[in-house]
Design a protein with these regions (language model features):
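C-terminal regulatory/interaction regions
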Residues: 458, 462, 466, 479, ...
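N-terminal metal-binding scaffold of metallo-dependent hydrolase/deaminase domains
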Residues: 1-53, 64-65
Length: 510
C-alpha cells in the first residue's frame, strides 16, 4: 500500500481507526488515518507516511471506531446535581422540584461545580458539543461568567443560550390558576420566569452576540417555550437570530398539558402553537423545537415545509409520562431531527448511547411496517443533524477535511464488540458508553485513556461534595413545599389527562 504524505501543519495523527466517514459504509467502516492540523481535520487517507517529528502526537486506533463527536442538542446544566432524585413525577409537577425559579440563589461554587460535572459526564460519554439552555434565576452576571469560565477550562464545545420568558408559568399550565387557591399562586412556577431587574435578551445581545467570537463557544437564543413568550418576544428573538446568524432553541409540546394549553388558548390558530409561530414568522431552519411529542400531522407538515428542526429527548419524555414522539411521521416528512439528553433531573444520564437506542426502538415500535434503517438514523441525529441545527453543519458532525477535529474513539476490546457484525447497529443497540476511550475537541485530546486531561477529575468530584449539603437541604425544603401542594397538583393533572385531545401519545394497553 502506498502511503500519502502527511499534510502540512499536522499536529496529531489517528492511525488505523475504523472511521464513520460521510461517504463510507457505517455498517463496515474502513480503517483509515486521520491527520489533524491545529483544530481542523487536515486529511483522511488509507495511510499516511511516518515522519520523525516529535511535535506530532499519534494515537494508535487499531481496534477502535472513530466517530464524529456527538452533539447533545438539548441540555440544561442548571440541575446537574439533581440526578436520581425523582421518579413517577409528571412534567408539570417536576418543574416545581427541579427548576431554578423554585430555589434560593445559588453560590458561585455550586454553579462552577455543576457546570464542570455535567460537561465531564458529557465528554466521558463521547459528546464533544452540548447545547446548554441555561436558566439563571434570579440572573446574576457573575454566575454567567462562572459558567463560561468553566466551559473554557474543561475544553468542551458549547452552543450556549440563556433561557428566558415574559409570561409567568402559572398562566401557561392548564387549570392551575383555577384550581390552586390564590394564596398559593406565588409558589407556582415553570422553566423560566420573567426577570424583573434586567432585559435578559438585551443583555445577552450586548455581552454575547455582539462580542468577539470564541473558539469553542457558540451562541444561541433560548425562548423557553412559545406559550411562555409573548408574540413580541418571539418576534424580537427571531430578528436577533437572523441578524447574528445564530440558532434558536425552544420547548414545544413536551407534555399533554402543553398541547392542551394550546387548544385552550389559541382558537384563532386552531389550537396550534406551530401555526402561531408560523403566523409570527418564527418557523425556519434557525429554529429547533425540543421534545415535539404532541405534534399533529398538519403541524409536522408545516415544520417540514419551513425547514424547522426538532430535538427529541426520549429518556426524559418517557420518565415524566410525556409520551412517545411521532418519530416515523417526522422522518417520513423529512423534518431535521436532533437528539438531546435534557435535564439530569429527568433523563438523569447524559448518555447519547441511551438516547440513540431509545430513538431507534421507539421509531420501530411506532409503526408496524418496516421503515428506514434506524441505527444509521440515530447516529446521524446524534451528529450531523445536531450540528446543522446549531448552524455548525459546515464545521462539526462529520469526519472530513476542513471540519473541526471533534472526534470520539471507541475501544472495541470489549464483549460489546465481539463478534463485530455491524458497527452502526452495535453502536446504537449494544454500546452503552463503556467503550469511550479518547475524546478530541477542537484538535485537543481532552479525554485520553478514559481520563480528563484538562482538569483533575477528583477536583470536580471534591467540589461537588462540598456544595451538596446545601443543595440537599434546599431540595428537601422544596420537597416539603411540593408535598403541601400535592392535592391541587393531583386535581389539575387528573383534569389534564381526562380532557380529550384528537390523538394520544401515551401507550395505554387497555
Amino acid at each position: 500500500m502506498s502511503l500519502e504524505p502527511i499534510p502540512a501543519g499536522t499536529t496529531l495523527i489517528i492511525r488505523h481507526g475504523r472511521a464513520l466517514l460521510p461517504r463510507g459504509d457505517w455498517h463496515e467502516p474502513d480503517a483509515v488515518d486521520i491527520a489533524i492540523a491545529g483544530n481542523v481535520i487536515a486529511g483522511v487517507a488509507s495511510g499516511f507516511a511516518r515522519v520523525a517529528d516529535a511535535s506530532i502526537d499519534e494515537i494508535d486506533a487499531r481496534g477502535h471506531l472513530v466517530l464524529p463527536g456527538f452533539v447533545n442538542a438539548h441540555y440544561h446544566s442548571h440541575d446537574v446535581l439533581a440526578k436520581g432524585t425523582l421518579e413517577e413525577v409528571p412534567l408539570e409537577s417536576w418543574r416545581l422540584y427541579a427548576l431554578p425559579p423554585q430555589y434560593p440563589p445559588r453560590s458561585m461554587e455550586e454553579v462552577r461545580a455543576r457546570t464542570l460535572l455535567g460537561a465531564l459526564e458529557c465528554l466521558r460519554c463521547g459528546m464533544t458539543t452540548i447545547q446548554d439552555m441555561l436558566t439563571l434565576y434570579p440572573f446574576e452576571e457573575r454566575h454567567l461568567d462562572t459558567v463560561m469560565q468553566a466551559y473554557e477550562r474543561i475544553g468542551i464545545r458549547v452552543v450556549f443560550s440563556l433561557q428566558y420568558a415574559d409570561r409567568r408559568g402559572l398562566e401557561t399550565i392548564p387549570y392551575w390558576k383555577d384550581i390552586f387557591p390564590k394564596e398559593l399562586h406565588a409558589q407556582l412556577s415553570t422553566a423560566a420566569e420573567p426577570e424583573r431587574q434586567i432585559d435578559l435578551l438585551g443583555y445577552f445581545e450586548r455581552t454575547c452576540l455582539a462580542a468577539p467570537s470564541r473558539s469553542r463557544v457558540h451562541w444561541a437564543l433560548g425562548p423557553s417555550a412559545p406559550e411562555r413568550c409573548s408574540p413580541a418576544l418571539m418576534t424580537r428573538t427571531m430578528e436577533l437570530a437572523r441578524r447574528y446568524g445564530v440558532p434558536v432553541y425552544s420547548h414545544i409540546y413536551e407534555s399533554r398539558g402543553m398541547a392542551l394549553q394550546a387548544r385552550l388558548t389559541l382558537p384563532e390558530q386552531g389550537g396550534s402553537l406551530i401555526k402561531r409561530l408560523a403566523a409570527e414568522g418564527a418557523l425556519g431552519p434557525l429554529l429547533n423545537l425540543a421534545h415535539s411529542v404532541w405534534l399533529a400531522r398538519d403541524e409536522i407538515d408545516l415544520l417540514a415545509a419551513t425547514g424547522t428542526g426538532v430535538v427529541l429527548n426520549p429518556q426524559g419524555n418517557l420518565k415524566m409520562k410525556c409520551g412517545i414522539p411521532p418519530i416515523r411521521a417526522l422522518q417520513d416528512a423529512g423534518v431535521r431531527i436532533g437528539l438531546g439528553c435534557d435535564n439530569c433531573s429527568c433523563s438523569d444520564a447524559q448518555n447519547m448511547f441511551m438516547a440513540m437506542k431509545l430513538f431507534a426502538l421507539l421509531a420501530a415500535a411506532s409503526d408496524p411496517l418496516p421503515g428506514p434503517p434506524q441505527a444509521i438514523a440515530a447516529l446521524r441525529a446524534a451528529t450531523e443533524a445536531g450540528a446543522e441545527g446549531a448552524c455548525l453543519g459546515n464545521a462539526i458532525g462529520r469526519i472530513e477535511p476542513g471540519y473541526k477535529a471533534d472526534l470520539t474513539l471507541i475501544d472495541m476490546s470489549d464483549p460489546t464488540w465481539s463478534p463485530l457484525n455491524n458497527a452502526a447497529r452495535q453502536l446504537v443497540h449494544v454500546e452503552a458508553g463503556r467503550g469511550v476511550r479518547h475524546v478530541i475537541v477542537n484538535g485537543a485530546v481532552v479525554v485520553r485513556d478514559r481520563r480528563l486531561t484538562t482538569i483533575d477529575e477528583d477536583e470536580i468530584y471534591d467540589a461537588v461534595e462540598i456544595v451538596m449539603p446545601g443543595f440537599r437541604r434546599d431540595f428537601a425544603a422544596i420537597c416539603e413545599r411540593v408535598k403541601r401542594l400535592q392535592p391541587w397538583l393531583d386535581q389539575a393533572h387528573q383534569r389534564m389527562v381526562s380532557t380529550e385531545l384528537e390523538f394520544d401519545r401515551i401507550y395505554r394497553p387497555f
